[in-house]
Amino acid sequence: MDDKHDAEPMRSQAWQVADRVDPCLRAAVALGWADHSGPVGMVFELMPGLAVKSLVAALGQDDRVRTHWQGEQAVFGTAWLTRASAARWCEQGPPACIARFEVGMFWRDWRDSEGTTPTTPAVVPPRRQGARSSADTLLVVMDHGCPFAHPDLRRPDGQTAILRLWDQDDAHALGALARCPQPWGYGADLDRTELMALLAQAGQDEAVCYARMGYHALQRRAVHGAHVLGQMMSPAAHDVVFVQLPRSQLQTLSRGALLSFVLDGAMYALSLAAPGSRVVVNLSLEAYDGPHDADSLWASALQALVWHARQAHQVTWTWVMAAGNAALLKVHARMHLEAQVPQTLVWRLPPVSEHVAWLELWWPEHMGDLTLWLQAPGDAVSWRVPCGALSVWPSPSHPMCLVAYPRAVTSSGRSLRVRLAPTASGWSHPVTATAGDWTLRLSGSGTGTVRACLARVWQGLGGHPRGRQGELWTGQEVSLSSHDLLRPDDGPRPDSISGLVCDIDGVRVAQAMRWRNGQLEETAYSGRGQVRAVSAHCCEESGLLHGVRGWGALGGQTVRMNGTSVAVPQAVRSLTSAGGRAPP
């Protein structure tokens, strides 16, 4: 790297040291909402001792609390903000009743999606109440694609095991019978009676039923949600609630984009659970980014929900999550910094990617401010990134690179975020970034470990390639003279466990195993981290035929899928079976 650094290469906006605004929200406002569409969703924690009415009183006229729950120490919840209110929070800070908050916004799909988005009624009638589960165990699946008419989902009385199906996308695919669940006020759902009515209208033909509904997620054979259900279901008479997460959030599986929708889905399921029952949630998704600790807002909200379910509803609540498949993907890196000794991190940004890319750096509070220089591919000069500021390069009108570097200390330590624009230009997004190796050089006055992680870039639903995942390489893995990447056989990377996983009560982590020499061993791709996976299941039946065979979208169809997302439903089946072992 060239040792010459421009003094003021980046246009910066200073932050206050005690700034409590989510850096992702500051970035969204600074970019004029270029990456996002729709309202701003958020997860919040109130100051201890305050009730949710204190937040309601502070919100704008068109802002709304979606749901909330009382934890052992404080109230947590989700809410919608208008863009005007979000911008005001950036300028003035959040209301005094807010202890902390994180935003989760809809990702803008710049590509023309005509023909793939179902037609939505102008107004979806509200559903204010519905039949609750009477089963001892309620299973909850948060995924994409629910084959409610599958023959193997039928109960002895002929009805489907799906108690309720909630499509959280406003452009829902559930047909005219669907209702908008309250108090959440978005998406649409169907109960068991309505699902069976739709199937009866189609002459008990699954394919015809899904086609008439416009349920596009099930109009192909390989559907992730269907495979998960097939691995999870057992002969026991459990009710199932299926929460279909918004398509826009699945386009880019960043941790922040998922949080509010997953928590809304959990409270939706809790409202249907019978007192004294147990609820087991199958979350087969993963995220790469996040602080990966038990002190984050996400972890605290999960813990509070488990406590609330037990105290207010007499419900035993268990989350089952995937360890993730990122151990070999080079999306995590760890650097040990010595005082005044620079370290290098190379971020390889792939070409022809239609999604923005995000990098997060996390380090302990005691290390203080880090000095960061950034160098674009092909440039001979690096730029110093100012601390305590939001910086845009090369200009606010052409934001190829954005760095959010607050001085504020969070419960998880210090952090900064780097956003790079898409590298594809064949559509209407106005700004693209240079593909290649973006080099970051870090130094500081303290000693400690800096963890780097990329946000997940999803290739695209329905087989439509849209995004490509970048890679991270530390200085030990890079020849600085030629930037040739070395590829040592060092095995899986540490800190690669899913960013949704946290070491708290009520969370079980499932990892993927494979058969080798007659024994089960952990797969190389299964995520590793400080949170230990306590449930291990076979996700590779053969060295030649990868994955586990399971349900397709229709009865009689089978597909193979692998990964820790396949281990999660097997872990759920083990938890809910009488003997504690998964039946065949």
Residue ranges and their predicted role:
Residues 146-226, 385-438, 443-475:
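Active-site core segment of subtilase-fold serine proteases
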Residues 249-335, 355-367, 398-502, 554-569:
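Substrate-binding/access-modulating region of protease and related hydrolase catalytic domains
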Residues 2-41, 47-53, 59-69, 95-98, ...:
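Extended charged low-complexity segments that act as oligomerization/scaffolding linkers
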Residues 46-47, 69, 142-145, 243-248, ...:
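Active-site-proximal beta-strand/loop segments in catalytic clefts of secreted hydrolases
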Residues 72-74, 81-160, 272-279, 288-321, ...:
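Conserved, well-structured beta-alpha core segment at the onset of a catalytic domain
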Residues 126-260, 276, 290-294, 367-368, ...:
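Subtilisin-like serine protease catalytic core
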Residues 2-138, 145-161, 436, 495-500, ...:
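Autoinhibitory propeptides
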Residues 167-171, 189-201, 330-415, 423-428, ...:
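Extracellular S/T/G-rich loop segment that most often corresponds to the catalytic His/Ser-adjacent loop
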